[in-house]
Amino acid sequence: MLKPLGDRVVLKVEEKEQKVGGFVIAGNGQAATKTAEVVAVGQGIRTLNGELVALSVKEGDKVLVENHAGVEVKDGEEAYLLVSEANILAVVE
């Protein structure tokens, strides 16, 4: 499993399928955001005086992330998205 460093977060993006006339269209290239589940989080970032500030998200959170943010990485057969916490727009409740 991937263990992110600093303020980075590993996400599993939810693929949404659209059907048009019985055909499945994978993904939505026009969307500005996508929904993902937080799989792993880094330890946080250090302030100038050395204090560790934890991230605002935790494993299992469902989040809204910018569509073109981060780097896609593979761990075995699974594909994940590695993003900075700043690219996460909101926690979906």
UniProtKB/Swiss-Prot annotation:
SMART domains: Cpn10. CDD domains: cpn10. GO terms for biological process: chaperone cofactor-dependent protein refolding. GO terms for molecular function: ATP binding; metal ion binding; protein folding chaperone; protein-folding chaperone binding; unfolded protein binding. One of its GO terms (cellular component) is cytoplasm. It comes from the Bacteria. Together with the chaperonin GroEL, plays an essential role in assisting protein folding. The GroEL-GroES system forms a nano-cage that allows encapsulation of the non-native substrate proteins and provides a physical environment optimized to promote and accelerate protein folding. GroES binds to the apical surface of the GroEL ring, thereby capping the opening of the GroEL channel. This is Co-chaperonin GroES. It comes from Streptococcus sanguinis (strain SK36). The gene is groES.
